[in-house]
């Protein structure tokens, strides 16, 4: 079973019970496989986003809703998957940054990795405001996470991805300031990414 589906349903089981959660997981897995078949033509650059994150989230959300779970709660179960995933990964990143003295280099690395992994080939469109000092600053003005979720009638789950970014980047190091103030998924006109090193 796909990881996001399995974990978000296990989180739901804490409240709704294992039997119902297992039924939802089975339905979500089936829907996920349908989404993969429907979108087999996704570009290689887009697939890491859609196949691993977006389609599983849509499938889980739809399955939660089909079982009568309110929209806000269904979004919360998906969001909680990303929160718990970040809680596992961030301490490792913090150790690496401290151990190798990488804090100063992180903004440039973040910019390089972001533009490569979230590039135009994957459906993202950028603007690059002027950077000041040691920072990564860019605006995403077109986001396939939002566009795909909207196409499937559930743009509200996009904020679960946005919140996952905040959990992942918001506490990497005391001198690294995560300064994003808005996202398309939360109703903004862009996602104004900012990761800044401050002495």
Which residues does each predicted region cover?
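Short, well-ordered coil loops that connect the C-terminus of an alpha-helix to the N-terminus
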Residues: 18, 70, 174-175
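Solvent-exposed, non-transmembrane amphipathic alpha-helical segments
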Residues: 28, 32, 80, 84, ...
């Amino acid at each position: 079973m796909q990881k996001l589906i399995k974990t978000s349903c296990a989180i739901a089981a804490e409240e709704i019970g294992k039997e119902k959660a297992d039924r939802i997981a089975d339905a979500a897995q089936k829907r996920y496989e349908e989404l993969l078949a429907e979108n087999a033509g996704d570009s290689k650059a887009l697939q890491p986003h859609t196949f691993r994150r977006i389609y599983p989230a849509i499938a889980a959300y739809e399955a939660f809703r089909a079982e009568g779970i309110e929209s806000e709660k269904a979004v919360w179960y998906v969001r909680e998957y990303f929160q718990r995933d970040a809680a596992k990964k961030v301490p490792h990143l913090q150790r690496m940054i401290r151990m190798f003295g990488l804090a100063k280099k992180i903004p440039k690395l973040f910019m390089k990795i972001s533009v490569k992994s979230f590039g135009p080939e994957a459906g993202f469109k950028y603007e690059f405001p002027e950077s000041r000092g040691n920072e990564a600053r860019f605006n995403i003005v077109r986001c396939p996470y939002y566009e795909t979720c909207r196409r499937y009638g559930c743009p509200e789950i996009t904020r679960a991805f946005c919140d996952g970014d905040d959990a992942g980047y918001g506490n990497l190091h005391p001198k690294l300031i995560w300064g994003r103030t808005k996202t398309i998924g939360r109703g903004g006109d862009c996602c104004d990414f900012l990761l800044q090193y401050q002495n």
